[in-house]
């Protein structure tokens, strides 16, 4: 069995780098919606992890129970963050398996 030559290895590395950059661009361009309280609190994260929007249904705003509202906001953020991580894994995960093990990144 012959060893791959340096040109093949470099071409593979360049393809992988391009695919990685494309996957990163897709993730950054995404908006992820997280929800809590059956949609009473929604939070939108950018693909870069920044909060873009927060909506709170008036029904869950109770001055006597601020703690519940805080929990709902945290829950919506955690939901959006998990979805963002899942998206990143979906887009970037396959890149680690390219080329019979790929290159370490």
From Swiss-Prot:
Record Pfam families: YbaB_DNA_bd (PF02575)
Query: GO cellular component terms?
Result: bacterial nucleoid; cytosol
The molecular function terms in GO held by this entry are:
DNA binding
**Compartment(s) where it occurs, according to its Swiss-Prot or TrEMBL record:** Cytoplasm, Nucleoid
Keyword line: Cytoplasm, DNA-binding
Q: Which domain of life is it from?
A: Bacteria
Q: Which InterPro entries match?
A: YbaB-like_sf, YbaB/EbfC
Note the HAMAP family from the entry: DNA_YbaB_EbfC
Q: Which PANTHER family match?
A: NUCLEOID-ASSOCIATED PROTEIN YBAB
Q: How does it assemble?
A: Homodimer.
Q: Which family does it belong to?
A: Belongs to the YbaB/EbfC family.
What this chain does, per the entry, is described as: Binds to DNA and alters its conformation. May be involved in regulation of gene expression, nucleoid organization and DNA protection.
Query: What name does the UniProt record give this protein?
Result: Nucleoid-associated protein cu1912
Supply the source organism's classification. Answer: Bacteria, Bacillati, Actinomycetota, Actinomycetes, Mycobacteriales
């Amino acid at each position: 069995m012959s060893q791959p030559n340096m040109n093949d290895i470099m071409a593979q590395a360049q393809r992988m780098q391009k695919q990685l950059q494309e996957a990163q661009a897709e993730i950054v361009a995404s908006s992820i919606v997280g929800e809590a309280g059956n949609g009473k609190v929604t939070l939108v994260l950018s693909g870069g992890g920044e909060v873009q929007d927060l909506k709170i249904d008036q029904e869950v705003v109770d001055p006597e129970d601020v703690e519940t509202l805080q929990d709902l906001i945290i829950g919506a953020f955690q939901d959006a963050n998990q979805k963002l991580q899942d998206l990143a894994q979906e887009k970037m995960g396959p890149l680690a398996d390219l080329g019979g093990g790929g290159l370490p990144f």
